[in-house]
């Protein structure tokens, strides 16, 4: 809780990076190398996220493929660095290879965690109970030059 309080104070004092008016785009490239712990799964996914102008809701559209076994559940987590040394579930995602919905950012630390790269998607399966694939939410869209090569490599497997 202490880290959450610190992030909330920082967010209120200096504001999150990129907190200008208007909707913000985020993306996640999701695979086994980012799972906690990493694994050799061939499953992969991509997520598109839009933070509304009021910075209170994060709409998401996430697609997955090639799971090793059946999905058990999936979530949006805050990682240990953004939550006092412990990963925590912030939002449950619907089951299935296509996930659409809205995550309401109820606490200031959630917005700070989003802008500082501490939020990630994690998909748990029967084979990989701790998470078969995961991916951090990053600013921008996947077509930006910094991520396009990685996406191209991901989908050309």
Where are these regions (language model features)?
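Bacterial N-terminal signal peptides
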Residues: 4-15
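Metal-centered catalytic cores of metalloenzymes
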Residues: 16-74, 78-149, 157
